[in-house]
Structures are given as structure tokens and as C-alpha cells.
UniProtKB/Swiss-Prot annotation:
Residues 1-42 are annotated as: Disordered. Its main location: nucleus. It comes from Homo sapiens. InterPro entries: DCAF16. GO terms for biological process: protein ubiquitination. Transmembrane segments: none annotated. One of its GO terms (cellular component) is Cul4-RING E3 ubiquitin ligase complex. Keywords: Acetylation, Nucleus, Ubl conjugation pathway. Interacts with DDB1 and CUL4A. This is DDB1- and CUL4-associated factor 16. The gene is DCAF16.
Length: 216
């Protein structure tokens, strides 16, 4: 499930800013994550709940290489759209990293209960009342997912909208664009001042750590 490295071959090396973006992507690519997770390439035989926690734990290791997002760096946002990146995998298990959605052409709604079916984990409903370990695990998982969903929803509500014509650009074109035209277009149509969001990786790590403490 290792991420594919971006292909910057078509980028103009005469523009220092694009070179800087390429270097930025290479430094934070999934290659580092692949090497660190080499020994954990196979998922252990765990219960659905423990399996989810195991996946989140692996992705949390990768998150230590994440850097602050630059709203003007479209190349990084395009990298986030690549379905092979750990960020996309994390979205698939319900913790959607949509804090960069202010310049992503098409936004996806965040449901009240994030979908978990894509990774083989059944959706959890209300926390169980039994004092068993399983019920405590369910309650903690629910809390972590609800926390992440609430934070991401707040971020989306504060996201800077982009012009309507940018919404017409297919995601496939965005993720495969290496000519620099889309980068230039987005830079000209998005705000340059810092965007205030409520989502933080520290908060996310606290929520996930609570999950792992209870279930592993």
C-alpha cells in the first residue's frame, strides 16, 4: 500500500518556486513512511476494532513527517489527492484530512458517522453500556471519530471558497497536473494570508492516543 512518489519530470526547473515545491514533496513523500513501516507490512490477526486501531497507529507514525500546509502550494494539495498516499488512506477509515479544502476543487461532505466499511470495519453505533473491555473500546473509538469529525467540520466551515470555475476541474486532472498551469491558476485565485483553522495534529494525536490506550 506504499504511496507512489510524485512525478515532477514535467515541471519547469527554471522556476525556483516550483523546484522548492518539488523538494518539499520529496521530503514529505510516503517513501519515508514505507521504510519505517517495512516490518509492519502485514496486518496482524486482530479483531475489527483492534485492526482499525493498528491502521491508525501506523498512519500516526507517518504523521510525524507532515509539515505545515502552505495554502499557496498547489503541488502539495495535489499530492494529498493521490489515492495512494497515507493521507488518503486515513480519509478512507473516516478521519478525513480536509483542512486544505479551501483550494481543492471538489469538497466531500463529512457525515456524522465516518464510513469505515472500506477498510472492513463495521460502523459503530451508540457506545455499549457493558463494563467489558470491548464496550470500552467501542466507546473510545466512537469518541475519537466524533472528535475528528467535529474538528474537520469546523475547519470546512472556515475554509476559503474558491471561484466557481475551479470547481469544474476534474479531480483526475488536478492530481495528474504537472505542467504548472494549475498551480499558477490556483495561486492567482486563492487568498494569501494565513487561514485560521481549529484542527491541529496535536489534538488529533490526543484523540488517537486515547483510542490506542483503550484498545491495544
Amino acid at each position: 500500500m506504499g504511496p507512489r512518489n510524485p512525478s515532477p519530470d514535467h515541471l519547469s526547473e527554471s522556476e525556483s518556486e516550483e523546484e522548492e515545491n518539488i523538494s518539499y514533496l520529496n521530503e514529505s513523500s510516503g517513501e519515508e513512511w514505507d521504510s519505517s513501516e517495512e516490518e509492519d507490512s502485514m496486518v496482524p490477526n486482530l479483531s475489527p476494532l483492534e485492526s482499525l486501531a493498528w491502521q491508525v497507529k501506523c498512519l500516526l507514525k507517518y504523521s510525524t513527517t507532515w509539515k505545515p500546509l502552505n495554502p499557496n502550494s498547489w503541488l502539495y494539495h495535489a499530492k494529498l489527492l493521490d489515492p495512494s498516499t497515507p493521507v488518503h488512506i486515513l480519509r478512507e477509515i473516516g478521519l478525513r484530512l480536509s483542512h486544505c479544502s479551501h483550494c481543492v476543487p471538489k469538497l466531500e461532505p463529512i457525515p456524522e458517522w465516518p464510513p469505515l466499511a472500506s477498510c472492513g470495519v463495521p460502523p459503530f453505533q451508540k457506545p455499549l453500556t457493558s463494563p467489558s473491555r470491548l464496550s470500552r473500546d467501542h466507546a473510545t473509538l466512537n469518541g475519537a471519530l466524533q472528535f475528528a469529525t467535529k474538528q474537520l467540520s469546523r475547519t470546512l466551515s472556515r475554509a476559503t471558497p474558491i471561484p466557481e470555475y475551479l470547481k469544474q476541474i476534474p479531480n483526475s486532472c488536478v492530481s495528474g497536473c504537472c505542467c504548472g498551469w494549475l498551480t499558477k491558476t490556483v495561486k492567482e485565485t486563492t487568498r494569501t494570508e494565513p487561514i485560521n483553522t481549529t484542527y491541529s495534529y496535536t489534538d488529533f494525536q490526543k484523540a488517537v492516543n486515547k483510542l490506542l490506550t483503550a484498545s491495544l
